[in-house]
């Protein structure tokens, strides 16, 4: 696949078939995605691949616990989960944003039907969070994980698969850690 074409054809895909995705395909995507750059080239990520029906349902339920209030904010014309605890007013395109989020709501309600979910963790000891002392929310730490995640999205496109990134599960990390028996020191 040509790079610029891949960059333009890797949207957030929120409608899926129930066609199975083979282990070989998952391995190929992850094996190539792991070459993503990371701070200090530490590559402290770990991926939990979820194909079990019960686990997918539990992950989807946890996702909806965060999605539902986020969507409610949008219906009220605000952007939820702002770093200062407020919901900032949407400045442009409120109706457009809400209409797009309605499609995302369909995904949130049916997430458990997706053939494969991947939960991406990072070993916190590998991160150099250079903006942690600034008077704003940190954005640097995720930089060592999102390169991998984007490579996964591109790999899925290369394999003819749809994909979508969501970060809402991070707020449910404790429950996810219990579900996946995640060791201490990792962030979702």
Identify the meaning behind each predicted range:
Residues 35-41:
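Glycine-rich phosphate/pyrophosphate-binding beta-alpha loops
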Residues 113-116, 161, 184-187:
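Short coil/turn connectors at secondary-structure junctions
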Residues 49-142:
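Glycine/small-residue-rich phosphate/adenosyl-binding loop
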Residues 29-34, 118-127, 131-179:
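Small-aliphatic-rich amphipathic alpha-helix that forms the alpha element of a beta-alpha
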Residues 15-16, 46, 162-166:
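Short catalytic-loop micro-motif centered on adjacent basic/acidic residues
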Residues 176-188:
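Short terminal or interdomain "cap/linker" segment that borders an active site or interface and mediates
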Residues 1-31, 42-43, 186-188:
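Specificity-determining recognition surfaces
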Residues 41-44, 112-114:
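Short, basic and Ser/Thr-rich N-terminal targeting/leader segments
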């Amino acid at each position: 696949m040509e790079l610029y074409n891949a960059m333009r054809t890797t949207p957030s895909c929120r409608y899926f078939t129930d066609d199975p995705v083979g282990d070989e395909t998952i391995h190929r995507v992850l094996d190539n995605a792991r070459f993503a750059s990371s701070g200090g080239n530490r590559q402290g990520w770990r991926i939990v691949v979820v194909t079990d029906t019960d686990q997918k349902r539990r992950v989807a339920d946890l996702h909806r616990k965060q999605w539902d209030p986020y969507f409610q904010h949008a219906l009220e014309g605000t952007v939820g989960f702002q770093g200062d605890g407020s919901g900032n007013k949407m400045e442009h395109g409120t109706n457009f944003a809400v209409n797009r989020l309605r499609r995302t709501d369909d995904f949130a309600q049916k997430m458990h039907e997706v053939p494969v979910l991947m939960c991406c963790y990072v070993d916190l000891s590998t991160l150099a969070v250079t903006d942690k002392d600034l008077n704003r929310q940190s954005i640097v730490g995720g930089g060592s994980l999102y390169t991998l995640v984007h490579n996964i999205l591109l790999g899925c496109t290369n394999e003819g698969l749809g994909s979508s990134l969501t970060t809402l599960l991070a707020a449910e990390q404790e429950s996810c850690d219990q579900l996946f028996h995640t060791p201490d020191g990792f962030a979702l």
